[in-house]
């Protein structure tokens, strides 16, 4: 790259936080939340007993119950892309499905377990038993939550309300008749809030230790920015697109890092500076505005599932608070100023389909096919980028190009022009 100027877009995913020592994966959150229920590698049996004995107070959301079932089926989610894929498959198991009643949603789980049976009678009976267990836990959870809502609506005190008096069939029907996607979205909000509290505490703890998270983030950002770039970090103009909820770079005390950081956009929301506990109604003040979701690229118009897409949910997020010097800036300002963007550097992102729309828009904006922009997919030892994921991303983007011949030869063109590289930061000279 030129030694005179360097405009870059740096895309960071959860692998960035992980490389900085933050326990931010779904697997780490799940273990923190449910480890106490695990007996012999299984969670559901003791979780069911706990709900029946103590109620739902310690269970953040319905989604945690669904993911607990995946855990017991030996299909854990080590990465957020797997969680978001599960959300998509659960809500929208096949294209063209216009929402679900609760009964049909339960049916998805019935198929999930039966599909795992290997054809023998014993396997089928075991799958049926597991499915019934999940359904029972889910209905118990929903029934108790509905009972609490009824108490609030009627002004009764919880201690005077007998859950055993609840009409099971009426309660179940109330949720079937209600807008089930809305209920599931409300539950997803609770799941997001609970993860936000967990992550906030993890950041606090990481920065209290000598091996500080913010310091690691500054160092890693500097390594990414200076990789294959002759311009020192202080003279770069970098736009950071973060798929994380943390903002260690915005909190940086390193003058060179701050001068290079033109703007940072946290795509899926940010943690507040202070996280409070829930009030008596279960609300947080200030609220935690972070989102999980599914990609809306192929979601049919008018489909109730679209409310779960990241694009739709991002519209409801409050505007990100930025330092005064960053206000009014835009990621593609160099292009609007008649300059070029020399590099797009991706670090720590799984490249899963849940975020495809963002990469599609980014590649369109920089005119990937015709421009001179170089794509870097960078990683550190132990946090490797999967070449197949890079190929899949570019192949899918190529399908959108016209004429079609451009799309078919996109990856070859980038390689011939030396405009795509997968590299280990630890091996930089």
Where are the language model's segments positioned?
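SIR2/sirtuin-family catalytic core signature
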Residues: 1-20, 26-29, 41, 45, ...
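Short N-terminal helix/helix-N-cap motif within the alpha/beta-hydrolase-1
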Residues: 20-21, 250
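Short aromatic-enriched loop/helix-cap "lid" or pocket-rim segments at secondary-structure transitions
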Residues: 22-24, 278-279
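Extended, H/D-rich, highly charged conserved domains that either
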Residues: 45-323
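TIR-domain catalytic/interaction hotspot
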Residues: 316-336
